């Protein structure tokens, strides 16, 4: 090539680089070895399993050990089919420009893992930088993208700093507790969420003239596995704890005589939705509420009852107007 042609080629390549989305991230299916390492990792989730967690996840009345759960998780890993991999690749390609806009928030690589029923009943979730899908992808592409973006928020949230995560949760009024003191019998009934890095957050709502600090808390009911209830999600019972905030943001359950310590969702839904928005009923944790709103943001929803949540989230993530 002549010097002129080389110069023209360089200019054209430069223009193409500006025209294409600057996506640094890789989205791909995990290898078997990567998947095993991720689902059996001794992360905060596996280190903090409760007796209820082990019983219902292992489907064993007497419970078990984290080592047994790791073995169950590993055995439940399933290879992707060519058709499934093609659908995931096509989804990423369709969303390349949007994903490029998130590059500052995401890890360099996001992995896709296919899990069976032995991994938390097949419920999609995340671990580390991986999205763990269930045994089957949603049939409709729109549903797949909604699920993908919901789970991608968890990867984003996990990758960011605690201060940035606090800032995200603060968009809907949640504040961190430096420590939480709960009765052992209550803590032992808790169901851990692998998507949540830190469950210790409260939101202040109107308690009928006085502010009340609420903490969403997922419990197991019953708290031990029952063969008559083989479905993992059928054990979920969400409650809201009445929390007292003390010095240096220490938190504890209110136990004063004549004061309600634990609320049902129905008892607090009005003031709660006034604070966090009514776009989703997924209020197990600020993380899950924001994940749904993030998915709505990324899929272009504009018909939600509280678009202010979407607007705040877009601004915080520095995304362009939809």
Task: Please describe what each predicted stretch is.
Residues 1-10:
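Bacterial N-terminal signal peptides that target proteins for export
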Residues 9-18:
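Bacterial N-terminal signal peptides
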Residues 19-24:
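Boundary at the C-terminal end of the N-terminal hydrophobic targeting segment
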Residues 25-85:
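N-terminal mature-domain "stem" immediately C-terminal to a signal peptide or N-terminal signal-anchor/transmembrane
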Residues 69-127:
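Auxiliary, metal-adjacent structural segments of Zn-dependent hydrolase domains
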Residues 115-149, 158:
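Active-site scaffold of zinc-dependent metalloenzymes
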Residues 152-169:
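Catalytic Zn2+-binding segment of zinc metalloproteases
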Residues 169-317:
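Metalloprotease/metallohydrolase-associated module, dominated by Zn2+-dependent proteases
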């Amino acid at each position: 090539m002549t010097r002129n042609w080389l110069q023209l080629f360089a200019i054209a390549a430069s223009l193409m680089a500006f025209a294409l989305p600057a996506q640094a991230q890789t989205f791909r299916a995990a290898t078997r070895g990567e998947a095993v390492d991720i689902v059996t990792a001794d992360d905060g989730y596996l280190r903090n399993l409760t007796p209820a967690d082990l019983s219902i996840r292992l489907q064993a009345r007497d419970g078990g050990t984290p080592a047994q759960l790791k073995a169950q998780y590993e055995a439940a890993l399933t290879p992707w089919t060519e058709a499934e991999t093609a659908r995931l690749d096509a989804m990423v390609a369709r969303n390349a420009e949007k994903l490029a806009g998130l590059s500052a928030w995401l890890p360099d690589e996001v992995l896709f893992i296919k899990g069976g029923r032995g991994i938390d009943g097949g419920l999609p979730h995340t671990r580390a930088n991986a999205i763990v899908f269930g045994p089957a992808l949603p049939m409709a592409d729109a549903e797949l993208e909604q699920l993908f973006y919901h789970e991608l928020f968890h990867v984003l949230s996990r990758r960011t700093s605690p201060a940035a995560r606090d800032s995200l949760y603060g968009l809907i009024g949640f504040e961190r507790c430096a420590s939480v003191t709960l009765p052992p019998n209550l803590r032992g009934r808790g169901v851990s969420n692998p998507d949540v890095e830190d469950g210790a957050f409260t939101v202040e709502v109107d308690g009928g003239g006085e502010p009340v600090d609420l903490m969403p808390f997922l419990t197991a009911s019953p708290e031990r596995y029952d063969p008559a209830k083989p479905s993992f999600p059928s054990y979920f019972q969400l409650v809201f704890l009445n929390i007292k905030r003390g010095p240096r943001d220490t938190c504890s359950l209110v136990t004063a005589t004549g004061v309600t310590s634990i609320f049902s969702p129905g008892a607090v839904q009005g003031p709660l939705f006034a604070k966090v928005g009514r776009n989703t009923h997924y209020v197990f944790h600020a993380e899950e509420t924001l994940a749904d709103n993030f998915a709505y943001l990324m899929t272009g929803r504009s018909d939600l009852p509280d678009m202010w949540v979407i607007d705040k989230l877009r601004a915080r993530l520095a995304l362009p107007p939809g």
